[in-house]
Amino acid sequence: MSLTVSFTGELAAQCSPLISRLGHAGFPSALASGDATLWGPEAVPEASIRLGWVQPLSRWEPLAREVVALREELAGQGITRVVLCGMGGSSLGPEVMAAHAGVEIAIVDSTHPDSLLPLLVDTLAHTTIVVSSKSGGTLETDSARRAFEAALATQGLEPRDHLVVVTDPDSPLHHQAIEAGYRVFLGDPTIGGRFSALSPFGLVPAGLAGVDILAFLEAGEAARLECLSEGSGNPALILGCAIAVDNPEVDKLLLSTWESAPGLGDWIEQLVAESTGKGGLGILPVVGYGL
C-alpha cells in the first residue's frame, strides 16, 4: 500500500515551492536522524527528548508478541472483553484500529455516569480493563480506574486479575500498578501522546481486543519509511506544507467520514486540533458527517 496526498488550484501553487525547498534542504533525512534543530533553536531542549516516534517500529515487535500471548492466556480464563480507560489519543487510536479490524473494544473517556455506569454494573468476570495514561496522573482515567477497582471488589473479583496498565516509566500510575500487582506495559517518554498509536498505548488495548497488531506494525513501518523518504512525492512533506502554508484564507480542515475506516475522521480531528495552533495560528478541523 502506498500513501498519496494531492491537491489542486491555488493551494498547489502555494505549496509547490515550499515542498521543493524542504526537499532540497534534506528535511526528511534530518527528521529521520532525529535532528532537534528543525524547529528552531528555542525548541531544541524539548524537541531533543521528543523524537522517539521517528525510530523504526520493529522495536515494538517483542511487546506485540507479549500482548498476543497475554490475550491467549486471558482467553483461556474466559476473559475476552476489553474496556479501555484513556483520554484523547490514548483511546481514539485503539478505537479506530479495533473498528477497522472488526473487533469490539469499549472506551471510557468520560466521567459522565451515562457512559461509565453501564460498564460498572455489568458482570466484569470476563472483562480486562486497560488503564492507559502517559503521565500517569490523568484525573479522568484515574477516576475510572478507582471505579472499576471498586466494582470488581463488589463482584468478588480480584482487581489484579483484570486490570492492565499502560503508562510511562516512573509515573504515579506505574508505582500504583506495581504496588497493586497489576500487569504493566511501559511506553517511551520520548514519544508524545499524539504519536503513540503504534507504541504500547495503542498496541496493548488493540492487541488484547483481537487486532492483528503485528500486521499494523508492518504496515506502519512501510508508511514510516515512505514519510521519511527524499523526493517531492513524500506524502508527509506534502501534507505538512499544505497545513502550514501561509494563507489567511485557509484556516479549516474539512474531514469526510469513511465507511471503510470508522472513527478515523474523529481521530484526525483530535490530532490536528491538539498539534497545531501552539503559536497562535492553526487549522480548525471539522468532521463533516454525511459529506
Describe each model-derived feature in a short phrase.
Residues 72-230:
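Glycine-rich phosphate-binding loops that contact phosphosugars or nucleotide phosphates
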Residues 67-70, 149-151, 239-240:
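Short alpha-helical segments and helix-capping/turn motifs at coil-helix boundaries
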